[in-house]
């Protein structure tokens, strides 16, 4: 068995034969890309795009014109408008709601094709590329047939198809970044690992939760304990610094609206910081347990939806729980109908 794994790991693709290396998964990836692209473009051109598509299109448009992350549509959702009944402003910076600097990576593409449909193409491309990176990652230890089965399960999962067929969202970058980060970890390419770690945390203000899970795995597996501890400190510290000091510079939305809408059951008052929410969760373990399992029916269906495409193998794999456990915990502890919806972006 060890000899087989060694042979697989030593069959490293070079730039010249990379296409040959990923060729077994290309038919499935191409089918996924084409079908999803046709469906999402039909959705957009049939005028079924939602408000979020307009927000991201406006943000991209303003970014390429030097008005970075300004959005009047986002302003209409701000606490100043929702709670204080103020008029939306055109110069409102969305970074107070969601801190998403990683979107600047794709601004040159949007500058070439400045249209909301470009974002639909970008969405499908990013999630498809995430699957290809998953295949390359799986091939580090598995033969092509098993790697194809795992990646095919990714492309067939409800938690992937649903978010791919909705409007553009920033979480679509996460699979590509995280799978690349894990590949870099396996290859000991630490420069790429830390680059992906940096890109991951700037996807969204809560993306550091996924990175924190990777750090926990690195520590508990005893493979890279020092790097893992550094990842945990970096991701957790970044989220605390960002949500408590940086985002409030742009607006009060994180404390007066978003934290309360998602985790208001753990705190009292009309505003709360991430530190307040964390303390509220840890200081009441009974409520923590209740929130984890209720509503029971929806929680079970959500877990089944996540595990079924992978034949429930992640459920018995400690590594899966250490990496995915913290993002899952964030969803289970939240409130609202969207947190346990398997077919929208949060499931990805």
Regions found by a protein language model. Give the residues of each.
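Start-transfer (signal-anchor) and selected internal transmembrane alpha helices
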Residues: 1-38, 223-231
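Extracytosolic helix-loop segments that constitute the early lumenal/periplasmic catalytic or substrate-binding loops
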Residues: 55-91, 101
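Membrane-interface transmembrane helices that cradle and orient dolichyl/undecaprenyl
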Residues: 141-142, 170-173, 178-192, 218-222
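Membrane-lumen/periplasm interface segments of specific transmembrane helices
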Residues: 36-38, 47, 52-55, 224-326
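Transmembrane-helix motifs of polytopic, lipid-linked glycan transferases
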Residues: 108, 117, 121-141, 180
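Transmembrane-helix signature of polytopic, membrane-embedded enzymes
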Residues: 128-159, 175-176, 192
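Juxtamembrane segments of multi-pass membrane glycosylation machinery
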Residues: 88-122, 144, 286-300
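Short acidic/glycine- and proline-prone juxtamembrane loop motifs at membrane-interface regions
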Residues: 163-171
């Amino acid at each position: 068995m060890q000899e087989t794994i060694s042979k697989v790991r030593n069959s490293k693709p070079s730039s010249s034969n990379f296409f040959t290396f990923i060729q077994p998964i290309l038919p499935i990836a191409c089918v996924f890309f084409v079908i999803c692209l046709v469906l999402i473009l039909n959705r957009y051109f049939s005028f079924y795009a939602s408000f979020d598509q307009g927000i991201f299109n406006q943000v991209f448009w303003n970014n390429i014109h030097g008005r970075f992350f300004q959005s009047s549509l986002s302003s209409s959702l701000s606490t100043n408008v929702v709670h204080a009944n103020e008029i939306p402003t055109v110069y409102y910076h969305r970074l107070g709601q969601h801190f998403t600097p990683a979107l600047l990576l794709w601004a040159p593409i949007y500058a070439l094709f400045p249209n909301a449909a470009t974002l639909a193409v970008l969405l499908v491309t990013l999630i498809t590329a995430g699957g290809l990176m998953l295949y390359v990652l799986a091939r580090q230890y598995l033969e092509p047939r098993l790697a194809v089965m795992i990646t095919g399960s990714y492309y067939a999962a409800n938690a992937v198809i649903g978010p791919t067929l909705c409007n553009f969202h920033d979480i679509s970058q996460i699979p590509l970044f995280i799978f690349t980060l894990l590949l870099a970890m396996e290859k000991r390419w630490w420069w790429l690992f830390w680059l992906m770690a940096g890109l991951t945390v700037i996807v969204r203000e809560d993306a550091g939760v996924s990175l924190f899970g990777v750090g926990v795995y690195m520590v508990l597996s005893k493979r890279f304990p020092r790097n893992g501890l550094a990842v945990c400190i970096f991701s957790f510290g970044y989220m605390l610094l960002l949500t408590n000091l940086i985002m409030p510079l742009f607006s009060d939305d994180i404390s007066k609206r978003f934290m309360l809408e998602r985790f208001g059951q753990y705190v009292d008052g009309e505003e709360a910081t991430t530190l307040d929410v964390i303390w509220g969760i840890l200081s009441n373990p009974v409520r923590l347990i209740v929130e984890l399992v209720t509503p029971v029916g929806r929680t079970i269906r959500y877990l089944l939806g996540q595990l079924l495409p992978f034949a429930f193998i992640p459920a018995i794999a400690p590594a899966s729980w250490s990496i995915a456990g913290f993002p899952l915990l964030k969803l289970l502890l939240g409130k609202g109908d969207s947190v346990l919806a398997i077919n929208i972006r949060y499931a990805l």
